Design a protein with these regions (language model features):
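N-terminal auxiliary segments of SAM/dcSAM-dependent transferases
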Residues: 1-97
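Amphipathic, non-transmembrane alpha-helical secondary structure
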Residues: 16, 120-127, 207, 211
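SAM-dependent Rossmann-like transferase core, predominantly class I methyltransferases
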Residues: 70-132
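Hydrophobic residues in well-ordered beta-strands that form the structural core
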Residues: 90-91, 160, 225
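Conserved SAM/SAH cofactor-binding pocket of Class I
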Residues: 109-190
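S-adenosylmethionine
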Residues: 163-262
């Protein structure tokens, strides 16, 4: 387990950022003027910690040993997450709602269930804007929710990448959970352009990698940007000058935007 000690005024935003990075549970422990956010990040949490510190450099970080059975109690309380219409993201050990089109997700020790607003928004816009049977690159793939969702629901051929070492295993597991054979892992941006890029990652990375994201997308292709707080969207979009906005959606203070590459 990893402890993040933050000022009381920053606790909600830091916790929200941890959710967006894919953690599956957070325990909040109140101290004198501070809050400790305790969460599991698997065996190699360094990349996720580095991403958080890019945005919150003053956060104090430490590791603690917790009994595995205690750490996994969150699984008893996990529930399906509604995305849009009849589409749900469902924990792999739970039953799907009757009549739903379900994407089953096993987060392993590192990633989330896809129930954070950034993932819900990204998948919602992908289902709305990406054409069936497209080629798709999932940038910041985490547990593979977007790749597996696009492959399963839109018959897309997907490649995925995330800086976290365990993301490759998560993609493999969740593709198998959903009988998907058209998702593959690659060690970075693809060599060839694709019809659509799904980028669900923090705003500083969306900005830093904007040229790579645009260069990876075919002319006329779709870019889905998620991981932005609503107040960050304008600054992120300023770096995507080769694109025009198709639509956007908001949920719980987060914004996702669908763009067309001009």
């Amino acid at each position: 387990m990893v402890d993040f000690v933050v000022d009381l005024t920053d606790a909600e935003l830091v916790a929200d950022t941890l959710w967006s990075l894919g953690v599956v549970a957070i325990e909040e422990i109140s101290n004198d003027g501070n809050v400790t956010l305790r969460t599991s990040m698997g065996e190699n949490p360094q990349d996720t910690i580095a991403s958080l510190r890019d945005t919150f450099p003053h956060v104090e970080v430490s590791t603690v040993e917790i009994d595995r059975a205690v750490a996994d109690t969150w699984r008893d309380f996990a529930e399906p997450t509604h995305v849009v219409n009849d589409v749900y993201l469902v924990p792999a050990w739970k039953d799907a709602p009757p009549g739903s089109r379900a994407i089953f997700i096993e987060p392993l020790d590192t990633f989330g269930l896809g129930n954070h607003p950034t993932t819900v928004l990204a998948l919602r816009l992908a289902l709305r804007c990406v054409q069936p049977r497209s080629t798709v690159f999932d940038f910041g793939s985490g547990s593979g929710v977007l790749s597996v969702g696009a492959a399963s629901l839109l018959s897309c051929t997907c490649s995925a990448y995330d800086i976290a070492d365990s993301a490759k295993d998560a993609l493999t597991v969740n593709a198998a959970e959903n009988n998907v054979t058209t998702c593959n892992w690659i060690p970075g941006f693809p060599a060839n352009t694709v019809d659509a890029v799904l980028a669900n990652i923090l705003a500083p990375v969306l900005i830093a990698e904007s040229l790579n994201v645009m260069q990876t997308t075919q002319t006329g292709g779709v870019i889905i940007l998620s991981g932005m707080r609503t107040e960050q969207a304008a600054e992120v979009l300023r770096h995507y000058s080769q694109c025009s906005e198709i639509t956007r959606d908001e949920l719980d203070g987060w914004t996702a935007v669908a763009l067309k590459k001009n």
